[in-house]
Amino acid sequence: MDKQYKVGVVGATGMVGQRFVTLLENHPWFKLTTLAASGRSAGKTYEEAVGSRWAMTTPMPESVKGMMVQDASKVEEVAAQVDFIFCAVNMPKDEIKALEEAYAKAECPVVSNNSANRFTPDVPMVVPEINADHIEIIPAQRKRLGTKRGFIAVKSNCSLQSYVPALHPLMKEFGVNKALVCTYQAISGAGKTFDRMPEIVDNVIPYIGGEEEKSEREPLKLWGHIEGDHIVNAEKPTITAQCFRVPVSDGHTAAVFVSFDKKPTKEQMLEAWANFRGPAQELNLPSAPKQFLHYFTENDRPQPKLDRNTEHGMAVCIGRLREDTLFDYKFACMSHNTLRGAAGGAVLLAELLAAKGYFD
């Protein structure tokens, strides 16, 4: 791509915002020009605003340290400086919806990491390898908003990114009837590090607010279809989920139990995973993993500590496939929750939108 788009990050000081900042450094298509956050941070340099809260393992990029943080609520000012924004704010859902819609109506496309608009009927919730065609709803959304350029597109919840990609090629070939999923989710998913979450040390917390509902409902929108001016959710598979917070820094793991309309052999499942390529790979998007789904033959893999950075944290790792006594099969999955599951997935979605001309 010859053009480089000017990009802003709204919610730049939080953990996901910090991940956006690191991912956008030296991005071939996107140039980070604007950082915005709450009024508390506005008027400070990015280094001052973040202070001791920098949570990335790599140092803060020199290019952003002296950049002035702007007030995210001054929508027209921020929107005028960029071609589109990434949004990763920590606010009540109704306020997030209002803020994202305000940016869209200011003719500034929004690529959101937030959950507030995931079930807005004409807002595409996209994993580029799975349902890239859902971005075709954007003209209908623009009509509702009364915009020419502005729109909202969102990524799905981080918990889904470990198991939905593994189920997707199996859905297409064999028809998934039902699935039971138990997720074991890293503390960075709560925006925490170990020094800021002492209660997780030597502990497992068997509840994450709202996470089980998202884990059961959101896949059905991903597997849905466009009908007129809205997206119709798929009716199956039936998914039941239990979500745990575990003492892991990064990387969400899932135990998956699945039954099929037409039960495949183990070899057919492994072949479906090995051969799967989505639009992100076909378009050769900059952040796309070459091999989306990686299967490990070792009995003790995948592990977050060993495998979360596979393909720069953008791959999904699978292992321990075997037949089950109640379901047809069971297996384990893992993905990096702040890369594939959050900022990295949003950057990949933005690359898809750019490649398809939605920012022009």
Region spans (language model):
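Charged docking surfaces used in two-component/phosphorelay signaling
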Residues: 188-360
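N-terminal Rossmann-like NAD(P) cofactor-binding subdomain of oxidoreductases
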Residues: 1-207, 237-238, 310, 316-317, ...
